Amino acid sequence: MKRIGNIRDTHGYLDTIDLVLDATMDQNIDMWLHAGDYGDDARYMQTRTDVPVYAVRGNNDRVHPLEPKEQLIPLEDTYIYMTHGHEVSYDKRIQELVHVGNAMGARLIVCGHSHVYKKELLGDTLFVNPGSIALPRDGSGGTFAIVTYEDGAFDVECVYKQDII
């Protein structure tokens, strides 16, 4: 079993990152994904945790050219495809990113950009956008996600900021 913390669009609000990391300290997270906006936030996360933190750059990360635009991350018998998602039209985003990720062998597709939580299962592929813990655009008060992968199946927990304060 693998547990994957999924956060993005933190935009420099390190206090929200601290809140998330403190709240999940005893939840056996195996890795963290930060899909852009801001790259420095992902580097900060790495100083606060002993597990790998994978990051990609977003549309507000122009000053962070070292972060890749996309990553393919091994996950047991499959892969995670991660990108910020701002270069794909909103109405076609899920289908296009799933298509790209599947072509690379990924069954978990993660992106950000919209600041709105979304999960969708397309066949055996899971698409997750954990929203934004810092600047939500959906009235949620802020969200992040924890994805569990066990015996070839995914489970997603949407965690609301008000539940960890």
Name each model-derived stretch.
Residues 1-4, 72-81, 121-127, 149-158:
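Beta-strand-turn-beta hairpins that frame and shape the catalytic cleft
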Residues 1-51, 61, 66-69, 140-143, ...:
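N-terminal active-site segment of His-dependent metallophosphoesterases
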Residues 6-8, 31-37, 54-59, 81-84, ...:
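Active-site neighborhood of phospho(di)ester-bond hydrolases with catalytic His/Asp-centered motifs
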Residues 11-15, 38-43, 60-65, 88-93, ...:
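Active-site environment of divalent metal-dependent phosphoester hydrolases
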Residues 19, 76, 102-105, 128-165:
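Binuclear metal-dependent phosphoesterase catalytic core
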Residues 47-56, 120-134:
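Short acidic, glycine/proline-enriched helix-loop-strand junctions
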Residues 48, 52-95:
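Helix-adjacent hinge/juxtasegments
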Residues 76, 84, 88-122, 127, ...:
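Catalytic core of the metallo-beta-lactamase
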